[in-house]
Amino acid sequence: MNDKIKENLLDQSCAPTDNLQSNWDRIDWTKAEQAVKKLQARIVKAQKEGRHNKVKALQWTLTHSFYAKALAVKRVTSNGGGCTPGVDKEIWDTPKAKMQAITQLKRRGYQPMPLRRVHIKKSNGKLRPLGIPTMKDRAMQALYLMALEPVSETTADTRSYGFRKERCCMDAIQQCHNILRKGYSPEWILEGDIKGCFDHISHEWLLANIPMDKAILRKWLKCGYVFNKQMFPTEEGTPQGGIISPTLANMTLDGLQKALADRYKRHHVNGKLYSPMVNLVRYADDFIITCENKETLENEIKPLVAEFMSERGLTLSEEKTVITNVHDGFDFLGFNIRKYGKDILTKPTKKSEKRFMENIRKVIKENKGCRQESLIRMLNSKIRGWGGYYQHGATRDSFHRIDHQIFLSLWQWAKRRHSKKGKRWIKDRYWHDIRGNKWTFASKFKKPNGKEDQLTLLSLTS
């Protein structure tokens, strides 16, 4: 065995199970996280130094580490999908089952089971397929993701913001502001749309370019799925629903920023430094590209992007990939971004407003007979989430409009409940004067300690 690999196998973070407490509840999670982070830091260092054999050795060490396996099991049993079984209908819901699961996470003899195919409704009413792995396969993906993520984060495009630690949608929107707010900023935007990105990524490209255990990756890609008790093969794509899938998709699209930068470098024209102002901002498979003129976007950049995608088995949607002027505005990540003079204003898209109100009306309609307190709690959860996402935009008009539509929907809800009562009675029954607002939708309720309190509907504008 290679001496370097022997050295890695002696790493303290690869402690054997018989040296640790066999009780799940007594695992030292702080120590486990420190050990894994130490190995991940070494992977990052080796990747930056171009020592690819060292990277592989460290990845092997990490994926065979007890602590990493324990953290993988903890992740898949602690998140929201921890009670969602795969085709084997197995869940790990006891400390004993979780401890036994750690011992099952072995490379030798590993064969993933087919995914359980389900469909969820998208905002446009269409169905999105999800592939749900078994608990064991999820844990194996979480384990190998710990070894892959240090590499993916080191090599990622700097302006990629989706499915990455300590990055979010707001970072991508802020980057759009940074690019477009200056007086000499680019004025033309290519709004990119990839046809079924997750569903069509080339398996051959992934196997040739993703720096992880190829045998394990091939098994995941080719495991197939079960739908309506029938088995189907998977010949392309990385299924939405797998823990490692977002990282694989990100790594597939990484490199586009460099391809654009290499093609459109700053250069001198007639003794002056010239920049074509080509910038990329990407969140997962949603991206925009800026440029100083429409022709370059249409005739050069769009074909370049199409070729980049084609190499990876992907295609741009001709209908949805459009070029717009920043003064006319463009939609990105649920925001409409538009330049007014020197100011960049962001607000919720009309599509987002419509979808939100459809959701609100659905909740109200489905709860015609529930108590006011219960309805307020359900609505507040949705209002808080939607309002929180858009709180930093130029949302005053949008929020006023939404508040008014919610009021109208609730007024109809109240009228249906008391069809024989007058408007004044209905108003006094459900709306109250609170902090100077006479039309506050509110309900009194009793706390566990017996004291009375008042629950009010959240307002986006207050």
Where are these regions (language model features)?
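Intrinsically disordered, low-complexity and often Lys/Arg-enriched segments
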Residues: 1-30, 34, 269-272, 451-462
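Phosphate/adenylate-binding "loop-and-lid" substructures adjacent to NTP/NAD/dNTP-binding pockets
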Residues: 55-127
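Extended C-terminal regions of large enzymes
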Residues: 406-409, 414-462
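Charged boundary/loop elements
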Residues: 21-81, 146-162
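A conserved non-catalytic segment of reverse transcriptases
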Residues: 312-374, 382-385
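Conserved polymerase palm-domain catalytic core
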Residues: 104, 108, 155-159, 164, ...
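Right-hand nucleic-acid polymerase module
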Residues: 1-2, 344, 362-424
